[in-house]
Curated annotation (Swiss-Prot):
InterPro entries reported for this sequence: Restrct_endonuc-II-like (IPR011335), tRNA_endonuc-like_dom_sf (IPR011856), UPF0102_YraN-like (IPR003509)
Species: Persephonella marina (strain DSM 14350 / EX-H1)
Name recorded for this polypeptide: UPF0102 protein PERMA_0362
Family as reported in the entry's similarity comment: Belongs to the UPF0102 family.
Pfam families linked to this entry: UPF0102
Regions annotated as coiled coil: none
A GO term, aspect molecular function: nucleic acid binding
Length: 116
């Protein structure tokens, strides 16, 4: 349960950061049979799919290093399902990672794409 609470705190910080950066939050914790997307936002007409990872330190690596190929594929499939379900067409889609270490936020834009 502790990791779930920490994860939610990280996602809350990421949402606050994105809003302060001018993003419009469309969805949080969108789930499908393919997986889950932490945050779906819009930035100047681009749909932004955001995976949030947070840690207390980098002693065992950076948070974003825990996102493996399998997780990326799940995020992409879930994003494709989301776009289809919401009938979103003709918009650019970007995949970002927000990495949080000790309250420091690192925003990695275009972390991967549909061809990953």
């Amino acid at each position: 349960m502790f990791s779930w609470i920490k994860g939610k705190e990280g996602e809350d910080k990421a949402v606050e950061y994105l809003r302060n950066s001018g993003y419009r939050i469309l969805e949080r914790n969108f789930r499908s049979r393919f997986g889950e997307i932490d945050i779906i936002a819009e930035d100047n007409g681009t749909i932004v799919i955001v995976e949030v990872r947070s840690k207390g330190s980098t002693g065992y690596g950076y948070p974003e290093e825990s996102i493996d190929h399998k997780k990326v594929r799940k995020i992409i499939k879930t994003a494709q399902f989301y776009l289809l379900k919401r009938d979103i067409k003709g918009k650019q889609v970007r995949f970002d990672i927000i990495s949080i270490v000790n309250n420091n936020i690192f925003h990695i834009k275009n972390a991967f794409d549909l061809d990953y």
